[in-house]
Structures are given as C-alpha cells and as structure tokens.
UniProtKB/Swiss-Prot annotation:
Domain called BTB: residue spans: 37-108
A Pfam short name: BTB
Subunit structure comment from the entry: Interacts with cul3.
GO biological process, one term: protein ubiquitination
Subcellular compartments: Cytoplasm; Nucleus
The protein's name: BTB/POZ domain-containing protein 2
Pathway entry: Protein modification; protein ubiquitination
One GO MF term attached to the UniProt entry: ubiquitin-like ligase-substrate adaptor activity
Keywords: Cytoplasm, Nucleus, Ubl conjugation pathway
Primary localization: cytoplasm
A GO-annotated cellular component: nucleus
Amino acid sequence: MSMNSSTEISQEPSIMKPVSSISSFVFNAGFLQGTFSDTTLIIKGETYHLHALFLGRSPVLLQKLIENNPKGDVHYTIEVETEDPYVTKESCLFVLSTLYCDSPRIPAEVNVCSVLAVSDLLGLDTLAFEASSLIEKSIRPETMESVIRFLDPNFEGLERLKMGMYPRFTSGLFNKAIQVMYNTLVSNWNTEYARLLCNLPFEVIKDLLESDKLTVGASSMARYKLANEIVKMRASFRKQNHIEGKGDESVVLAFDEGSRGIQLVHIAPGAESRRKIWKATSVR
C-alpha cells in the first residue's frame, strides 16, 4: 500500500490506467491513491485522506461527518479517539479499505483481533462478526493465552472474560475456549499441554477444574491428582521465570456431608493476604 512518511495514503495525482471493473477503479484510485479525497480522518494520531461518500458506510463515521460539517464545507476533518491497544495502524488501514470494497474477506496475515477492535470502533458489525468467527475457529490449547489476553487484557476476572472487551462480538468466546480445554484435558493430557496452563490466570484454572463438564476418572482422587500436577507445574514455572506477586496455590481433598471432592486454594501475597478456597468438584 502506498504510504508517505506521515503514514498518509498517497495523494499524488496520477494518470488512471484502464481497470477491469468499477470496484477495482474505486479501490485503486480512491483508497490506494486517494484521488480527489475530501476527508481527513485521524485515528490515534494517524492521518488518512479518504472520501466521505465511502466513509459514510460506517455509521460512526457518518455521524461524525454530519456533526463536523454543519456549513456543508467541501472538505471534512474528523477524528476518532480511542486508547484501545488493539487499534493499530495496520488494522485501521485494512478496515478502512473494506469501505471501498464489496464483500471483503479478512486475509490470514492480518491480526484478526485488531480487525475486530477497529470494526467495533467504527460500527462495522458484519466485519466484526466475521473477525469473531475467525477467532473462535482459531481457539486451541496453543492459542489459549493470547485469546484470554484479548478478552481481558487486565485480567479483571471471570465476568470480564465471559463478556470480553467487545461484548456484542466476544461474548461466548471464553466458554468456547474452556470447552476446548475440557476436551484436551480429558482426551489428550500430557506434560506439554500442562505447560500451556502455567501462564493462565488462577481464576481460569479454577473455572476449568471446578466444572462438572471436566470428567477425570471415576473418583475425586483422579481429579485431585490432575489438579495437583497442574498446580505444581504452575509453581515451578513461576519459580523458573522469577514471577513474583502471584501468591501460592495448592490442592486439598475436602469432605462435605458424606461426599468427597477437592478444593483449589489460593493464598495471595502480602502480610494481609487471605486464603481463598475454590471448590473444584463434589464427587463421591
């Protein structure tokens, strides 16, 4: 894509070559070359010279065009403010390019999480849902950490994880991720997979091990052994990588009204730490 030093789309006049279709002409002359642009769009300090006619396909940008040009001036200048770290220059370029196309598809080399973020920012629901679908299809044990980080960058807790940062498009992705983890733990447990659990937040491990959907053997002892192995590997991982401030985790057998199960125990760091006990199961 032709870009100058200010990351603006090139506005140099050029002789148009014959193209095979009007859509090709619009994309090449309009978006790539910025010919006859009438709108300056600013997103996170990056400037794009585009066309109000096509930007109007975004309900968010259309509203800004109307609000920022009450006198009907020939040229528009609009800005979209956001601090979302997933809104990047590359993702903005791709999403903006889709306004000049019919039925755009998200290429494999584009960060689909960033595409979802920009699509949500600009109110492009169809593209956002397509990005969400691609994220869901990409979920597997190896991608679990990045998916969870995308859903909840600050690890605010399970409620945020279940909804995600863009609830209309990300709610349900965490449940899908947990389901993949259930299936892997039950059918393909191995040391390599256990390592993938080392970096996940404790609340995620808790949710995984306490669920009735996780069937491990015929007794609570089998679940205890599995949970204990995971907790030990997480402790070893933190020690080897000098990760501090996470507190300690342990697993205990628990008895309640004749039934036996396990509990995951998390002891937070600091002098005022309190023991948090998470019930993982209640199996006889």
